[in-house]
Design a protein with these regions (language model features):
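Expand to "…catalyze enediolate/carbanion chemistry for C-C bond making/breaking, isomerization
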Residues: 1-240
Length: 240
């Protein structure tokens, strides 16, 4: 958001219907002159989380939270080399629930091209650190060209295969295509339930011609749990 539009963005947030939403609001980084006004706006918004730009120092986050008497959940944006180097420490912070990758700022700071294939090792480490510290699977970086929905879908498939739980989006037109990749379908849900039921009722080691072992069974159970959770939240339409 440009400097001239920041106050309008805060006013729009106050008017946004937040009922039924697990909402996180991106705020300016802790060194920014705008973060105080961002926080003042959030204080009027009820139980919304913070997506913290350029998250770098867990100790600075603690001091900032204590100074402003804030107890909100935080989603860290990994956008700098320093922040990436502190990923493990950030993921251990009690207020932090997960992270997301901002590849444009990160590549600028690192001095490389903003090519997600070149940044694959850093993306993989965010997935690893999130899992290691029991946090939510991270959100992958944006697809900047909003006219290229097919590319967005390819990027979502790639992110999902790498272990990301979702993707940062920059335009409403990207929401449904991304959901179609990351959210379990009704067919996937029913097939997972059938697999779990069959393996529970008999000593089956094959399902639809495929060998079933513990990792495959666990993935099916995770899909069922995710689908049920999303349906209960009523935020997403998982009945595609």
């Amino acid at each position: 958001v440009s400097q001239s539009q920041k106050q309008l963005a805060r006013e729009n947030l106050l008017e946004f219907d937040k009922q039924g939403c697990n909402l996180f609001v991106r705020v300016n980084d802790l060194d920014s002159a705008f973060v105080r006004d961002d926080l003042a706006c959030l204080e009027k918004c009820g139980e919304v989380g913070i997506m913290l730009s350029k998250s770098e120092d867990p100790h600075a986050i603690t001091q900032w939270l204590e100074q402003h008497s804030v107890t909100r959940q935080i989603l860290c944006l990994s956008e700098t080399v320093m922040g990436f180097a502190h990923t493990s420490a950030l993921m251990q912070h009690e207020n932090v629930i997960g992270c997301a990758f901002g590849h444009f700022d990160f590549s600028t700071d690192l001095g490389c091209e903003a090519d997600i294939s070149l940044l694959a090792p850093y993306r993989a480490d965010l997935v690893l650190q999130s899992k290691l510290h029991g946090k939510a699977a991270p959100l992958d970086c944006v697809t900047a060209d909003i006219s290229q929905i097919d590319q967005l879908k390819l990027d979502c498939v790639d992110a999902k295969r790498r272990g990301f739980g979702g993707k940062l989006l920059i335009h409403p037109s990207q929401v449904k295509p991304a959901q179609s990749i990351f959210l379990p379908s009704k067919d996937d849900y029913e097939k997972a339930k059938e697999l779990v039921a069959v393996t529970a009722s008999q000593a089956v080691i094959q399902f639809e011609g495929r060998m079933i072992d513990k990792p495959i069974l666990k993935k099916a159970e995770q899909l069922i749990e995710k689908y049920d959770r999303l349906m209960e939240s009523k935020v997403f339409d998982a009945h595609r």
